[in-house]
């Protein structure tokens, strides 16, 4: 949620990374089932990028994939299906045509990615002398695992943390996810966000990117501090197959609200890179602009193989991805057999 890194994590982190390894030995981790979608929330637009690098044009919005023109951010309705060619199939069987995004997008550091270009290796960097605010933007902390064999799904639980003590228009994202280690096009993400839709509040939504340069998300749903969130990504194919379609659900078990992307395409990717938990932020200039409780814990993390069975041995890595200019706060990542705790 643009891509914040363009090489395998250890190579990307560099001297600022803090790397911890944990061996996870577990089978039969309980996972949450699919919940029914019950609400009819409004569909607000993502937050304007007020704190973006100076070369990002006015009017662009923040997404978990970087900065996009608002016309290239699409809401997929509750009964709709996002097809592999970018069209949207509606409940009545009709299909909306796919329109490629005609605008460049920008990574969290301000690198420009032209329409039709992949996010790797990172786009055109900002011109010399372009101002970058002294703040944290992009991936901050992550727990991840890569295997040569593809995965069949992942799920994790976490609680909605406290709102930030200081509201400066910043955006916070928390999520597990799946990505293709060798073919970085997108990442499937069930996301909890604060101010993700210009609302200065907590919401959940499920995301996929970037067919035709567009970024797609499900209808966001409001949630509250203390609610139990379940993020679940499941391949929509038979056991033993590498799925081309996926269901992404972000579920509030406390309220019953669910925000789901159904049967969304893999866009030709094979998901062999898993994230137990990630903190991604935009516009953070001080420690009191993070969630005021200072941490998020992802628990009951369950990674599935292509047979849709729980993987009994996972070598999780925990990484701190500190950036130049980030405020000095209580950063840390701790991996336990079934959880990832991220502090800030």
Residue ranges and their predicted role:
Residues 15-28:
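Bacterial N-terminal signal peptides
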Residues 2, 29, 49-50:
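Intrinsically disordered, low-complexity cationic segments
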Residues 22, 31-33, 38:
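Cleavable N-terminal signal peptides
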Residues 10, 28-29:
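Intrinsic disorder/low-complexity segments
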Residues 36-344:
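Exposed, interaction-prone regions of secreted/extracellular proteins
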Residues 1-11:
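N-terminal secretory signal peptides that target proteins for export/translocation
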